[in-house]
Amino acid sequence: DSLVVFKSERKMLLYNDKILLKSYNISLGDNPVGHKEREGDEKTPEGLYMISGRNPNSKYHLSLRISYPNERDKINASANGYSPGGDIMIHGLPNTTGFLKGYFINRDWTNGCIAVNDEEIEELWNAVKDGTPILINK
């Protein structure tokens, strides 16, 4: 299995071998253009990472951890005097009720994470194993 993200298209693709299983519409950070460089920049990282863990008690329904920062990210941030940040996830919507959930659909609202709806994060939770590669493109 693998995940491929196209930030500019707001799409995430789930593959099994080379077979496309599903395409997801996604939301990104409030500052979506460019690679994440430091904590608080609200950017979604770009590059090759992996799913490195999961949180069943997420504030966003469920969440899958992305292995950001990698060594390159840490070196680049340190060279510029910054913390690279962390806690980049694929997650669902905030644990709110009713009409508030509609606010988060079809807009960028995260702090750099990749968001899908709650039904989709449940699908991904069951389909994607820890160690699955995720390639995040511009």
Where are the regions a protein language model picked out?
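Short, functionally important structural connectors and interaction interfaces within domains
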Residues: N16-K18, K36, D41, Y82, ...
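N-terminal post-signal-peptidase region of extra-cytosolic proteins
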Residues: D1, L28-S52, E71-N76, F99, ...
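Exported/periplasmic cell-wall-interacting domains
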Residues: G53-K138
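Intrinsically disordered, low-complexity
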Residues: D1-G34, K138
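Well-ordered beta-strand positions in beta-sheet-rich domains
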Residues: S23-N25, L48, D87, P133
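Short, basic and Ser/Thr-rich N-terminal targeting/leader segments
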Residues: F6-S8, P45, Y60
